[in-house]
Regions:
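Solvent-exposed, non-transmembrane alpha-helical starts
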Residues: 71-82, 115-120, 148-152, 191-203
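Mid-to-C-terminal secondary-structure elements
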Residues: 122, 127-141, 152-207
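Short strand-coil-strand connectors
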Residues: 109-113, 178-180
Length: 207
């Protein structure tokens, strides 16, 4: 019986080739679009390293200042200063961990070699490593003591370490950024650019 169905289907395809091609292409395109939408939803909602605890995250993206006067409509929105983060968020007791960060692009160089390629830099604190579970391939993150002391330490992704030193083994080596010499303390696996909160190529203390 199934062979008969297959023969009939093949015969119909041969009789109406153009219509069959359009129908099959349309069905395949619709299925592909559904799969893409499901994939995008999973990427944005499912937790995986370095955002394994994504379902427990709470984000505060900026601040808003508005007038207290009755009927006042004056408002000002923007990012947060480090003082706001320290006074309003570091003092919280309920969260297991709190972290502040900002991102920028900047070129990196070696002490004896000027380079011009720019990388995505994440200026953050020691709390970042408690929230995001980056898989380290060498070394480890900068500590709270390093952050408080303003010691110029740096964590690189594998790709950046390879670009700069030709190998992923970079702990203890020095990198120059904006005329400041940083010491590499750790190397992590590359972070997919689809992870908006944890994506970066270089991590340094914003202190």
């Amino acid at each position: 019986m199934y062979k008969q169905y297959i023969k009939q289907a093949v015969q119909m395809l041969r009789e109406n080739t153009l219509v069959s091609i359009i129908s099959i292409s349309g069905t395949a395109l619709a299925i592909a679009m559904v799969l893409v939408m499901v994939l995008v939803f999973q990427i944005k909602s499912t937790g995986y390293a370095p955002e394994s605890n994504r379902s427990r995250f709470m984000y505060v993206w900026g601040t808003e200042v508005s007038s207290k006067s009755p009927g006042g409509s004056d408002r000002n929105r923007g990012g947060m200063s480090s003082e706001v983060v320290k006074e309003c968020f570091y003092t919280l007791r309920k969260p297991e961990a709190v972290s502040g960060y900002c991102s920028d692009s900047h070129s990196l160089s070696l002490p004896n070699r000027r380079l011009f390629k720019e990388y995505e830099i994440c200026y953050t604190d020691a709390g970042h490593w408690k929230i995001f579970d980056h898989p380290f391939v060498e070394g480890g993150p900068f500590s709270e003591a390093d952050f408080q002391s303003g010691i110029p330490k740096m964590v690189l992704s594998e790709q950046v370490a390879t670009d700069l030193f030709g190998t992923g083994q970079a702990v203890g080596r020095q990198v120059v950024m904006d005329f400041i010499t940083f010491t590499v303390c750790g190397v992590v696996r590359d972070v997919p650019s689809s992870l908006m909160s944890s994506y970066a190529q270089v991590w340094i203390p914003y202190s």
